[in-house]
Amino acid sequence: MEAINEVIEEYETYLDLEGKSPNTIRMYSYYVRRYLEGGGELKARSALRFLAKLRREGYSNKSLNLVVQALRSYFRFEGYDEEAEKLRPPKVPKSLPKSLTREEVRKILSVIPPTKKRDRLIFLLLYGAGLRVSELCNLKKSDVDFERSLIIVRGGKGAKDRVVPIPAFLLEGIKAYLETRDDDSEYLIVEDRRERKDKLSPKTVWYLLKKYGDRAGIRVTPHMLRHSFATHMLENGVDIRAIQELLGHSNLSTTQIYTKVTVEHLRKAQEKARLIEGLIEK
């Protein structure tokens, strides 16, 4: 067990140097540890037996895909590139990202009391700036440029910084929240119920969204708000390359999935209008 701990520690250092996010490092380490503790070897056949075991345990293709990525990464770390290439992730059907309607966004915001300045700010940053939950939690006060009305999102997915302009309403929300703070934490948003004001945790964000979503009768997650940001921007005519930069996507193809969402939105609108049908129906 001690030997495995040492391997995992070195592997995590390798992932960190590769620029992987803390969440990716945590997930990869978890699956590699399970693999090694189960007697896994640096051979593709051994990995396939492990994947078959997880399949029997009920793992979906999407989950198995993550495990394959972790094992391929670990094999490369150990210098077994050829074995890594033999591992092929299962096909995962592409699904359109789920987003909220504008009315649903307004409804959820309406159930967050104006006195809950922190909670409203969390919601508005996820939707109004399209942030990932990890990026939101890592924001520092120094990342807000009040003069130019923008925030600097540092070390997001892929370890790339990006600049996100924010509207005046959101900037005022940040100022209003900071005026309620009497701590010296460097983080923009902190936990409320602790003596020491630690930075906001993803768990808290998920909890708050579930609470207010239940109150509004709408299912909402941090990623759904990010999807909604992108979809609504596209519907408003914003250029897809600008949306790509705002989201921090390295590949345009990742952003282009939102065009499918918008096409579906337009298709439904056309079906509802029934313009052609109205011409030919008696």
UniProtKB/Swiss-Prot annotation:
One of its GO terms (biological process) is DNA transposition. Gene3D superfamilies: 1.10.150.130, Intergrase catalytic core. Signal peptide: none annotated. Transmembrane segments: none annotated. One of its GO terms (molecular function) is tyrosine-based site-specific recombinase activity. It is found in: Cytoplasm. Residues 95-271 form the Tyr recombinase domain. The active site is at residues 132, 157, 223, 226, 249, 258. Belongs to the 'phage' integrase family. XerA subfamily. HAMAP family: Recomb_XerA. Site-specific tyrosine recombinase, which acts by catalyzing the cutting and rejoining of the recombining DNA molecules. This is Tyrosine recombinase XerA. It comes from Thermococcus onnurineus (strain NA1). The gene is xerA.
